Amino acid sequence: MTGKKLLLIGSGGREHALAWKLQQSKNVTEIFAFPGSIGISQLEKVQLVNNNEMNLKDFKGIASWCKINHIDLVIVGPEDPLAEGIADQLKAANIHCFGPSKAGARIESDKSWSKDFMIRHHIPTAQYGSFIDALKAKDFIRNTPNALVVKASGLAAGKGVIVAENIEEACAAVDEILGDHKFGTAGDVVVVEEKLSGQEVSVLGFVDSNSVRILPPAQDHKRLKDNDEGLNTGGMGAYCPCPLISQQELDIVKSQVLQRAVDGLRKENILYNGILYAGIMLTHDGPKTLEFNCRFGDPETQIILPLLDEDLYDLMMASCTNHLCNVPELKFKSNINAVGVVMASKGYPETSTKGCVISGIESVETMDNHIVFHSGTSKNNKDEWITNGGRVLINIALADNLKKAADLATKACDVVKFDGSQYRRDIGKKAFQIHSLTYKESGVNIEAGNSLVGRIKSLSYGTHRSGVVGQIGSFGGLMRLNDIKYINSNGEESNYKDIVLVQGTDGVGTKLKIAESMNVWDTIGIDLVAMCVNDVLCNGAEPIGFLDYIACGHLEVPTVATIVKGIADGCRKANCALIGGETAEMPSMYGKGKYDLAGYCVGITEYDEILPKINDVHVGDVVIGLPSSGIHSNGFSLVNKIFQQTGFKLTDIAEFSDSHKSYGMEFLTPTRLYVSETLPFLRNGYVKALAHITGGGLLENIPRILPNHLSVQIDALTWKLPKVFSWLAAHGNVNANEMLRTFNCGIGMIIIMPRNDIEWETIPEARMIGSITQRDHNGPQVIVKNFKEVLHKEVTHWKKGDAETTSISYKDSGVDITAGNELVDNIKPHAKSTNRKGVIGGLGSFGGLFRINECGTKFEDPMLVLATDGVGTKLKIAQQLGKHDTVGIDLVAMCNNDILCNGAEPLTFLDYFACGKLDVNVATNVVSGIAEGCRQSDSTLLGGETAEMPGMYNPNVYDLAGFSLGVAEHEDILPKKNCLEVGDIIIGFPSNGVHSNGFSLIHKLFELTGYKWTDIAPFSAYGKTFGEEFLEPTKVYVKEISPALKTGYVKALAHITGGGLWDNIPRVLPYNLTAELDAKKINISPVFAWLSLNGNIDKLELLKTFNCGIGMIMIASKEHELEILKSLYGSRASVIGKIIPTKPHGHQVIVRHFATCFERVERLLSIPKKRVGVLISGSGSNLQALIDATKSTNMGMCSEIVFVLSNKAGIFGLERAAKANIPSTVISNKDYATREAFDVALHNELIKHNVEIICLAGFMRILTPCFVNKWKGKLLNIHPSLLPKYKGITAQKDALESGDNESGCTVHFVDENVDTGAIIVQEIVPIFENDTVESLTERIHVAEHIAFPKALRLVASGYVRLNDKCETEWA
């Protein structure tokens, strides 16, 4: 075949793309472009036609030129020549033209005709009217109920469409088009049509007189600015394929829009060979046609053609010759996406700026999978690319997913630079932006949670006893110890004096699986209480308070309310108040209908009544056994394994049941509570020890109360072995020793008493089952005589013939006692590292003991504060990444921050760790984090529970619950609601990121967007992965807030946890007061902006779900503001709002400017960081603070340190720069004859490193006015005083000599004078009575390390600038 010659008419980016694709055809040898462009001329097969050879308006001349030059095909890019009839003239000359006839082009050039055509041929479109009379058009508008779009009927370069917001705008548009003739003759007729709602998609197809071959759908972006704001343009970018249109909808467009159009044109004898472009709106009623275009779209063409896996010339010829029917469905690159971002010149679309030099085009063109198409470029006499139009060029990127392609294309625009360039950073966002996510859609139902709280409050209230203060729903449960009395050994009512608090935590293990299978939940709560209360009892303590933790996949309010009712029943039986709890809905960790429970009990006893009295236990003491009610709550993994292996069903009638109950109902018999019969018995002082027979059975639990040299000998003949145990032994072939090590075997509690004491006989069903003996050297501490024989006899009853079953052990069922013991050994050092005064004993006993009188604070009227929480689905990230060392900090922070909100000092902490298979290393890492959290909050890790529950958790999954106890004086308890008043200030404490709430929503977002935890987080300040950023631990506020609590001026604290700012602040307010916050004073972390953008999360939903940058708020009187802030120096806390009256029916939280500030942070995500240079002369402590801040995502610095310059060699500041991999240099002022010469050298070096902002961090040189003026508004300095006080180098000394009670530091813009520039930020530092210059200086340094990063952030982000009057101006 002879090589084909083509003529391409047009000069823009669309034509560049067409030429680029056509030259890839093996059939094409030459492409003539007219008028073309220099960009198009760079293509190998292209040559430009000289303007002297042709006139674009002279179609006969063009046809003649084609004949002379043997042109095989003419491709017409723009619509104007088609509308004027170029195709007709060429076809008349027997020249193939890819483009419709003049009559066919009318489908675009005459919108009134086009709308009528759609109606005639039943093409789905909007209702409309066409007018030449403005009055009639406006009358139609005023009488139409729908929102409207006003269009100039003719060609208006893509700008003649006005989407009216209201009737007035629509009428004004009519006046502009018909009255002012804004679009010339294109506006002789105006079309007014119904405004359709939905996503707009471009669908193009090759067509001839019969057939359609569809191209992949694309989406154009018409508005100038991000988020579809700004003026209408010809198109600022596009992407393809567009996933917003379904295959079903695309089929409708092909058949009911494009094919009907082709059929209609044929029926009306209109020639149409070319591209038919349909602008489609995806409405609720299906796809509707907005408009037709008669040519390739711009910029859609530029992103569709790189995906086309066909010969474009062949397709065009098939269209021109009516042979499309012979072309199979088109092929495109598989799993490839294309995104194009248009770069426009300054002033576009109203004007264009020409002649600006463009750099970076060649750099982008050399990148893999990048293409640059020129729309409006030229070259100057230096052979440099320059701007030559409104839309200058389009950067195309191809990638295997749309987000990546969009990111690459946008970053390419950062490489290509020219003065005044405009481009959008959100091209393609609509495709991967999911619908507006809510917390409820992620599986967490806040309303259900609130409903549950309402239902269980009465249950909780029914358990209250003396000492209880407040009710469920606050930040902790409160008990007033002075109100708790007991009957002493003399029978007198007495207050506790030397108080020891005994705390225990436990769960109910895989007994939950039985409850789940049977769907019977009313007694499992009793088990939970019994497991904790009985342990506390073993230390001689009276149980007084209880907390529960309930985790589930889906909160079914009736089920959880039933569980809590059981908990309340247990608490009433134990005279132990249910004063709080946590219900954690975690859809990505638990399946629907799946639950886990953990409980915590605190008891109270006198120091000299603590049990066990190990030193008082002697040979001959008697062992009393209290019968169990059945299996209780241990060993159920073995029970479940036996059922799994034998095939019995829980719903079958149990062979061992005397009351014909099913196996499930027998197994669900609740654990026996021993408080009521045992507690009075403890008061006589004869009891030496108690042992609760739980996990580990008789063999493991009794030794916990014995000295090493003694043992217990008990006789199985002294009590009746319940049938359930022999049945289990028989069907699981479990040996006697395994039974004794796994189950209670009928004895739920052991009491050790003196030999001659017979008071135990008053306890119902109590049995003397043995005595204390001398232990054989290294022999067992528990000897159970006759048990093997008793068990064998009972087992025989259940055996069927000679059938033997496989022997099953507890380890076989998935529970490894050895691993559990290894873990205890591993974590003991971690727990010990947290010890503080008051701790008694260590890990491994039945409860954790704490002596209040030794804690370091003397309490007159102590209040106990109890709190519980978990870490939620943040755990899932840790588990997927195998990073377990920080979630323990989260656990402690979530609990101890709540304790703090009551004005209390956290003292002790207990953890609950539940897993499917115990990995000792993982659990050790988790507990090491818990210990670190305890150290950060000065609380002690007093104990915990590790529950290995095969079948309830997958092997690599675990859940955590924490229980914290704090103490405060009664008069210091917060919130002081009665003291709150209008005008009080609200102080905000910055968060450390997301903390530990809202992660179910984050998981849902990741599920929908396809992000991975190992991907680099776009919002990260230091290139960390999503996983690393989201695992940043929750901030512990104890140490920074404690000094403020000691002032006595704090009225309330609110921990911003689940429910966000919206729901947590009202928890500390009376109904008549409202918190008014100012978002301009909150440093909103970039992570929240990223979540908002990518999850399309409504701003109110953000406030209801996340902390949004504030992890704790404090309320105090305005008059005490200075004292409070002085006590908080070094904490980054600041005033963010005030208390105002509540409006009728108003919410109790108002966040002013929230949407505006959030959107600003969202925009900052896509803006390159400001490049910062730091000038130093010394150790560089402020440099280090700036380095640390710019590497912290949560600081949101919008800047990076790219260069450090020193005027002195060998200083420590340079080492800091080197360690941070920041380039540095030394320019000594001694090497220059004048200050001016030195400053010129500084300036040149800073420019060389593209520095945009300079920070003077201890730079001991006075800069010249010339240098300062060059960097005006970009030069920051820090000074160690509250300017304008005490300028110069003796500021600290001056402050002390003046007798001031506060000093501080100031960050300011630098001007020509010393320390006189406009102030940006100040931090207050208190001056103490015995302060010296050195001590004050040291404290000011701490404040500087907060103030300088804060000021840099404000300037780099554009929140603060220096105006023309040299004053600080806030955005």
UniProtKB/Swiss-Prot annotation:
Residues 434-1171 are annotated as: AIRS domain. ATP binds at residues 193-196, 200, 223, 232. Binds 1 magnesium or manganese ion per subunit. Pfam families: AIRS (PF00586), AIRS_C (PF02769), Formyl_trans_N (PF00551), GARS_A (PF01071), GARS_C (PF02843), GARS_N (PF02844). Its cofactor is Mg(2+); Mn(2+). Mg(2+) binds at residues 291, 293. This is Trifunctional purine biosynthetic protein adenosine-3. It comes from Chironomus tentans.
